Amino acid sequence: MKKKIGLLVMAYGTPYKEEDIERYYTHIRRGRKPSPEMLEDLTERYRAIGGISPLATITLEQAKKLEKRLNEVQDEVEYHMYLGLKHIEPFIEDAVKEMHNDGIQDAIALVLAPHYSTFSVKSYVGRAQEEAEKLGNLTIHGIDSWYKEPKFIQYWVDAVKSIYSGMSDAEREKAVLIVSAHSLPEKIIAMGDPYPDQLNETADYIARGAEVANYAVGWQSAGNTPDPWIGPDVQDLTRELNEKYGYTSFVYAPVGFVAEHLEVLYDNDFECKVVTDEIGAKYYRPEMPNASDAFIDCLTDVVVKKKESVM
């Protein structure tokens, strides 16, 4: 009989319906309810992208497809997928409890974020491992980062190339690629967090692969807190690149995210487009990985490599 291995797929989570927004936001704010103004602002953002984010559906599809693919590419072990979310049910701890109840003794934990940071990957895996230790007889093997995975870089190289191939030579000369990820508080840099360096590396790999000479790294979707967050913000960067170098076509690659959701559909497709419209420039944004076969193949390689290194 094949050994059963847990596949713990973790992600940020998103409201399933408008009524969930307040409790979701309260969880993000560690139990502090948002003010009516803050709640209204977030609700309006969701309404602007069609009422609710497609993220919940995409995340589940990614996880299910990954489980299926892992069981197709090898027959030594049988992977069982469990979904654990940071800010809404099914919570990470609930997924770990379910694994334990099912008699799983080893699990590979994959966060749907390519870059490592203490705020994201470390906290997700930490929560899972803490719960597993409480329950006993369950070891969780966390994947730190997978931004260097060749198929991940290739996904974005192909996506960027598909945008540039539709441009004339003249437009290409005046085009710039902005590679971005979710901003985090600046204090992580002083703590030696590798997150900013990993994004810079990712941008270099993609630009090299796609043969794009003009590119820059930006940060987006910063939180509404008094602490300074990593910059430059993509909107400010857009204006600056236009003023300084006269770029008239902007290609946004939000590579820190793996799916279409609020941060991409609103912060890029709406807020960045407002800026490009204002300066008379063209706006482009390649398709997100979502649950595409190419992306699922990438994640499959990531999990298989981790499993081989620890078991």
UniProtKB/Swiss-Prot annotation:
Record flagged with keyword Ribosomal protein: no
Sites where the protein binds Fe-coproporphyrin III: Y12, R29, R45, Y46, S53, Y124
Positions bound to Fe(2+): H182, E263
GO molecular function, one term: metal ion binding
Pathway linked to the protein: Porphyrin-containing compound metabolism; protoheme biosynthesis
Classification via InterPro entries: Ferrochelatase, Ferrochelatase_AS, Ferrochelatase_C, Ferrochelatase_N
Taxonomy, superkingdom: Bacteria
Disulphide linkage map: none
CC annotations in GO: cytoplasm
Principal location class: cytoplasm
EC number: 4.99.1.9
Keyword annotations: Cytoplasm, Heme biosynthesis, Iron, Lyase, Metal-binding, Porphyrin biosynthesis
UniProt-annotated location(s): Cytoplasm
Reaction(s) the record says it catalyses: Fe-coproporphyrin III + 2 H(+) = coproporphyrin III + Fe(2+)
Function, as annotated: Involved in coproporphyrin-dependent heme b biosynthesis. Catalyzes the insertion of ferrous iron into coproporphyrin III to form Fe-coproporphyrin III.
Family statement drawn from the similarity comment of this UniProt entry: Belongs to the ferrochelatase family.
Name of the protein this chain belongs to: Coproporphyrin III ferrochelatase 1
